Amino acid sequence: MSAIIQAFKDADLRKKIFFTIAMIVLYRIGAQIPSPGVDYATISGRLRDLTQDQSSVYSLINLFSGGALLQLSIFAIGIMPYITASIIVQLLTVVIPHFEELKKEGQSGQAKMMQYTRYLTVALALLQSSGIVALADREQLLGAGIRVLSADRNFFDLIVLVITMTAGAVLVMWMGELITEKGVGNGMSLLIFAGIATRLPTDGMNILGNSGGVVFAVVLASVLILVIGVVFVEQGQRRIPVQYAKRMVGRRQYGGSSTYLPLKVNQAGVIPVIFASSLIYMPVLITQIVNSGSLEVSDNWWQRNIIAHLQTPSSWQYIVLYFALTIFFSYFYVSVQYDPAEQAENMKKYGGFIPGIRPGRPTAEYLGFVMNRLLFVGSLYLAVIAVLPNIMLDLGVDAGSAGATPFGGTAILILVSVALTTVKQIESQLLQSNYEGLLK
């Protein structure tokens, strides 16, 4: 508690914390403001009766937006266009030499890639908002025949609605970047954190009201065990000893110190889960738009397979695909973000070496070997956490209403991971000011 008080006594850190809180509050306010032409009363009444199966196509995406998607607020599509754009740009660094060169150019290259990500975000936001509005106009967003837009709407009203939701997605992207730049923690992750956290009280009361006190107590106990397990794994790391050789500069002696290189078990964080969920969401949305807003049986074979296998998260095809995509993005994201050869070269440049391992290529191979072993465990851990709620649904465990997912494995993983990362960043700034760390 004293450390938290000290954090607010630091003028610079206090300013960053208040700025972050202000941005999150503005984001949550925007998530509750209906877009123009939306029948909010009808949506509110319909969402209370929406079942898990009916909302399955959008459940995780709606969770990330804090319920804004199915309410058709001005922030309805939230950060999903930005996440999808980030996936595409990261993939381009592997397949297109120009993007690979940009990645190697350091800060200037990263700035250029960020610019490409922003442009692509606007395009994807326009595409996704058009799809959502098309479904709403056909009265298929919340079920067949459910009207969520005003009855006297015209084409111009739909255009305004698309522009509003697109502008909202761009504004959310800007707010996330501002938090990262001027606040504490990762802005996009904190916005997802806020969206999930705001759903917890309401959905907890829904579980208590629908299933009774015994089930509610079991859910709380399960969540507590899950939180402990997630914290344990997220804090786990492999510490590789590093020795720095002594060297003389003039009459001064430098080096000779010992330290370690920390490699986390879950090096990728929550990014693979978010990537995988957004990638599964896109073909279902496109199929629903192409198929005149309906998820009924289609004559087209690819539409028929998507409808049969990806419409319901409890199907084993959905579970296997989600599991595989999470593992794939774990390996892909770490391979993009962490380069053992670059790490080994930096160590060699400053006179560092791993005892028993020769500097240069042998060090890079050793780091790659250790990282692959850790990544195997970490990716399996992420995949199991991600599909755990889906397996429970497949076994017949009723998750309640559409909003019960904040108590699922993915939501808990995101909440705990973002909280730990943010606290560690605050702690590092406290340590710079000679304050006691928050984690002590």
Curated annotation (Swiss-Prot):
Keywords: Cell membrane, Membrane, Protein transport, Translocation, Transmembrane, Transmembrane helix, Transport. InterPro entries: SecY (IPR026593), SecY/SEC61-alpha (IPR002208), SecY_CS (IPR030659), SecY_dom_sf (IPR023201). GO terms for cellular component: plasma membrane. GO terms for biological process: intracellular protein transmembrane transport; protein targeting; protein transport by the Sec complex. Gene3D superfamilies: SecY subunit domain. It is a multi-pass membrane protein. The chain crosses the membrane at residues 17-37, 74-94, 116-135, 155-175, 178-198, 213-233, 270-290, 316-336, 374-394, 403-423. It comes from the Bacteria. It is found in: Cell membrane. Component of the Sec protein translocase complex. Heterotrimer consisting of SecY, SecE and SecG subunits. The heterotrimers can form oligomers, although 1 heterotrimer is thought to be able to translocate proteins. Interacts with the ribosome. Interacts with SecDF, and other proteins may be involved. Interacts with SecA. The central subunit of the protein translocation channel SecYEG. Consists of two halves formed by TMs 1-5 and 6-10. These two domains form a lateral gate at the front which open onto the bilayer between TMs 2 and 7, and are clamped together by SecE at the back. The channel is closed by both a pore ring composed of hydrophobic SecY resides and a short helix (helix 2A) on the extracellular side of the membrane which forms a plug. The plug probably moves laterally to allow the channel to open. The ring and the pore may move independently. Belongs to the SecY/SEC61-alpha family. This is Protein translocase subunit SecY. The lineage of its organism: Bacteria, Bacillati, Actinomycetota, Actinomycetes, Mycobacteriales. The gene is secY.
